């Protein structure tokens, strides 16, 4: 959700500051099929979580870790593009948090309530995986590397209430920087390789 917001904000900022959307066609992201695979795998894992059809938690958690490994690989080979340094840091932070917590991203019950998911919290015991997400309800005292987990809250009236991690914020900033920077490059400048 945070990355989606960053894309729209960056496009708006780029346009308001007289950037050219046509320049975005210049971006050449190497290994982009791995990024598509990562997004598809994560969407499948999150979408099938509620139906319990993806298998036991280790398999599902493994799918979430795998998506972040793929994202980190794509970010690493594109490190020379504007914003990809932040994307690498964010993807690495998320991967470390996931691995440290068994492949799931801890989120506090208070954060879930703040974004309007009281019913979900009431139904879940501490340590239970959150259906339809990669999250697990854990208080800060039980989460490994708590500072890297989903601790930032975007509550209502935000259009898409969500919780985010430090990694999510870094990835969002990197994506936003890539978009704005690219919109302000002239068409003669090649971005990426």
Language model region names:
Residues 1-67:
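Transmembrane alpha-helical insertion/packing segments
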Residues 53-56, 82-87, 104-115:
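A cytosolic-side transmembrane-helix exit/cap motif
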Residues 58-66, 161-173:
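Membrane-interface loop-to-helix entry segments
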Residues 70, 174-181:
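Transmembrane alpha-helices and membrane-interface helical segments
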Residues 70-101:
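Interfacial segments of alpha-helical transmembrane regions
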Residues 112-163:
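Extracytosolic (periplasmic/ER-lumenal) interhelical loops and adjacent juxtamembrane/interface segments
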Residues 180-192:
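Membrane-interface capping segments at transmembrane-helix boundaries
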